[in-house]
Amino acid sequence: MEESEINLVDSFEVSLLNDDSKDLLATVGDTGLDAIITGGTLDGVPILGVLNGIFKVTKNYQMRRLYKKMVLFLYGLSDFSQRDKENFLHEYTVANQEKGSEVLLAVIDKIDNANKISILCNLMRAKINGEISIDNFVRLCQVIERLPYVDFKNLVKYMVDYSELGTDDVLSSSGVIY
């Protein structure tokens, strides 16, 4: 792994586990996300400072998208304690047999719609609260990556006997229905 990748992963882990970021992240709810990204308000959060720095140098659109997803992710988990997040990362590391923060960063990066970040946060919340196992968390992360955001809204229809041409195939291939 290159040094820049290590710094990105390490800064993500520090940002995730650091309770001091809560005050900065609280501004997300009060201000428009795009204004925060452009203004550099959250550069004090290590991962966000790194991503914003890379974006300023490269003007890479993907980096801006990752920054936006990262803000939403950290904000969505800001009410959890450092200990809860440490325990989660440890369990996630063991389950993946790879550094948990690196795998989680890859999951966030692969998510194609920023609205799916709240779904990821809810899954992590369910895992931390003991409502799902770490194995199910890993599996459901794969579903988030594969399923188009628009089809998440259709899932509730499938709680009863329901079928919709086109949607059935996507949900089935994503492993959500059978």
What is each model feature region?
Residues 1, 6, 38:
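Short, surface-exposed loop/strand segments
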Residues 5-7, 19, 130:
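Short, flexible coil/linker elements and helix-boundary hinge sites characteristic
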Residues 9-69:
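Membrane-inserting effector segments that mediate pore formation, membrane fusion
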Residues 48, 54-57, 73-76, 91, ...:
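Short acidic/histidine-centered micro-motifs embedded in hydrophobic/aromatic stretches
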Residues 63-132:
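Membrane-proximal, non-transmembrane interface segments of integral membrane proteins
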Residues 102-178:
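Long, helix-rich, hydrophobic modules that act as membrane-proximal anchors or helical bundle/coiled-coil regulators
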